[in-house]
Amino acid sequence: MAGYRADDEYDYLFKVVLIGDSGVGKSNLLSRFTKNEFSLESKSTIGVEFATRSLNVDDKVIKAQIWDTAGQERYRAITSAYYRGAVGALLVYDVTRHSTFENVETWLKELRNHTDPNIVVMLVGNKSDLRHLVAVQTEDAKSFAEKESLYFMETSALEATNVENAFAEVLTQIHHIVSKKAMEAASESANVPSKGDKIDIGKDVSAVKKGGCCSN
């Protein structure tokens, strides 16, 4: 039987940011994923807030720290602190408002200006439950996502459609990148010569220092 694991016990902590225009449903995506709640009277977020949730990914406990902010221009002053340390992002637009999709490119540019090139980005078309009001075609969003090397899903925070999948996919992809980097680092350290190994003069001096002196 698996032992109890406290909420503050985790293998990795990943910061994920929600970006996109105001009113696209970022706060409801956050509350649906972290608390399984939805509010029809959700107001625009003032400033910044974040919530956390832990998931199991590849036998590791990943704690996601998900940050949410309002999309209005007047809050753009907080971008540097907001983006700092982020390893994943959900770039959200409203499938019923084409203007929010048009602004995705600007948000993506801002995100990339403030974050690591390896950041995992999921393009999210929210409010997919409003099928009769759709203004952004799925194929157009898919095409943009492919062009920019983004992941893509359509979600409904109201109906809880694909919300779990979108966050889980981002966290899984982040973990894959982190695991790959860890393996590469381990491989590099394994290549450091041990005592008795021949050391090429052309190699990095640090390798000589780590290998130790063993010549007679």
Curated annotation (Swiss-Prot):
Entry membrane topology: Lipid-anchor
Binding site for GTP: 20-27, 68-72, 126-129, 156-157
GO CC aspect terms: nucleus; plasma membrane; plastid; vacuole
Gene3D superfamilies xref list: P-loop containing nucleotide triphosphate hydrolases
Gene Ontology biological process: cell wall biogenesis; protein transport
Keywords of this entry: Cell membrane, GTP-binding, Lipoprotein, Membrane, Nucleotide-binding, Prenylation, Protein transport, Transport
Keyword check for Cell membrane: yes
Domain of life, source organism: Eukaryota
Pfam families the UniProt entry points to: Ras
CDD domains the record matches: Rab11_like
Covalent lipid sites (S-geranylgeranyl cysteine): 213-214
Location within or outside the cell: Cell membrane
Main location: membrane
Transmembrane feature ranges: none
Sequence similarity: Belongs to the small GTPase superfamily. Rab family.
Function of the protein: Intracellular vesicle trafficking and protein transport.
Name assigned to this protein: Ras-related protein RABA1c
Gene: RABA1C
